[in-house]
Amino acid sequence: MQPADDTLPLHAGQRLLQRRKAKGLTTEQLAALMTEAGAKVSRAAISNWERGSNGIVSNKLPVLARLLDCSESYLLSGTPNIPDATTLQPSVPLSPTVAQSPSLGDALLSDVSNAANARILVTSALLQDKDCQTVFSDSTSNPFNLSRDVTTMKTLNKSNKLQNVCYDIRGPLLQTATRMEAQGHKIIKLNVGNPAPFGFEAPQEILSDVAMNLPNAIGYSDSQGIFAARKAILQYYQAKGLLEAVDVADVYLGNGVSELIVLTMQALLDDGDEVLIPMPDYPLWTAAANLAGGKAVHYLCDEADNWQPDIADIESKITERTKGIVVINPNNPTGALYTTEHLRKIVALAEKHNLVLMADEIYDRVLYDNVVHVPMCTLAKNCLVITYNGLSKSHRIAGFRSGWMMLSGKKDHASDFIEGLNMLSSMRLCANVPAQYAIQTAMGGYQSMQALTAPNGRLYVQREIAVNRLNSIKGLSCTMPQGAFYCFPKIDRNIYPIEDDMQFMMELLQAEKVLMVQGTGFNWHAPDHFRVVFLPNASDLNEAMDRLERFFAKKRQEYG
């Protein structure tokens, strides 16, 4: 008979989760305590450990175990706390390296059943200790029966730089959904903003122009991109009221906006530098800042004010280490469109504190209800503005990876930073050249996205279905997005007392075969939101909402 789930052994992340909850700590509180104790770590890193996405970093382990009142070996392998080391006499003297290894000490304190754990930890310590080389010269001096070629078995771990990097949009939930699909389950996917799989076709004139120019696209281009595409981008913003004179040299083409975000953070941040990023955010911004050695500091967007940025919160979080402010407008994941008044106030803060403004405007042409998007570059002239945009969403060609960034505003003080951007652009040689030929055509002429977002257009109708159906479910509330193709409903935790929103979404996936991403995956501070992508057609979207309604009804019964 198969054992019940609660008898199965826990992995390290589950033991960590149990101990944290037993201490009554949130991931954010535990991260703060560890940082205060000298073992700097982020909430995202602890979440990664608990989910099993990353292993617990060895140099953080002693502090973690101390704060959770358990041994290191318990967290790593489940070994219970054991008596003093004097109860175990090793058959050979321990070198200083071995004797001082905290993890090894725990292993040596374990009973015979844990000899395998001790063997592994002794091996690790001995490999770092020159004093122990003689121990292995004679097989009779090898009490643990270790192979002489143990160096070939050294575990290859990911870089510690990735410990604070988290991107849940393609994380454990998607991985589970992929396994379920392989088993024959049909999953309704409301997790990724990729128009193509849902029947949104790219404009034919773009495909034709790219095909026609393929003979010209078989070699490298200029590192910043072909001239005609960059010129078309420049003229696009000039027509919108670009304040400062900008040259083609200020435009960089990239393999999607994602590449350019990472490139910017690498060029901008030294270790410990801070970037203000909206909460909730598109998680690549936080991941890129952390990967560059910086610190993502999240400012609040106010749900009661249709997710507009909280200007006072932004200002309160500016420090001497702050290098820039990120503005995602229209916003992913909330679908909010920021007012001109809010944008002007953010510009004023950037100018006052000499900060870089990074404006992610990839959804600037995906707008509803006749609203108008105001580019940040048309409002700022006394600070450096970097505008990010592309064709993935507005022209439904995400697979082309056709994106750009443009520098505007005050640039004299940023010459060294710009030199860094140029160097990094050259290191990746150039962006995908065939896709660069889509840009000039896309920037002018008929904008087919407008037909999709107008009343009775497909995206408009699907937005109405998603928001109205979500608001009809007891305990859910959702603001109406004015841009993009996402909404970010709130869960009333008085009705659904959720502690782990990823686990909640995992239960939804397994029970109802609907895939979405939890709110904390967008660096929201509480487990009470999730993101809905309303790209699927009306029939599939209604089916997903039926399943969601059924799932929440069952949860209400479960929670009583």
For the regions a protein language model found, what residue spans apply to each?
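A short, Lys/Arg-rich alpha-helix, primarily the initiator
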Residues: 1-25
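Short alpha-helical DNA-recognition segment
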Residues: 23-48, 63
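DNA major-groove recognition helix of helix-turn-helix/homeodomain DNA-binding modules
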Residues: 57-74
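PLP-dependent enzyme catalytic core of the Aspartate aminotransferase-like
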Residues: 150, 243, 315-316, 497-499, ...
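N-terminal small-domain helix-loop-helix segment of the aminotransferase-like
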Residues: 154-256, 263, 442-446, 555-560
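Conserved core segment of the aminotransferase class I/II
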Residues: 207, 378-457, 467-469, 551-552
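Conserved core of the PLP fold type I
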Residues: 217-348, 365-379, 547, 559-560
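Conserved glycine-rich beta-strand-loop-beta hairpin in the small C-terminal domain of fold type I
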Residues: 440, 456-467, 478-492
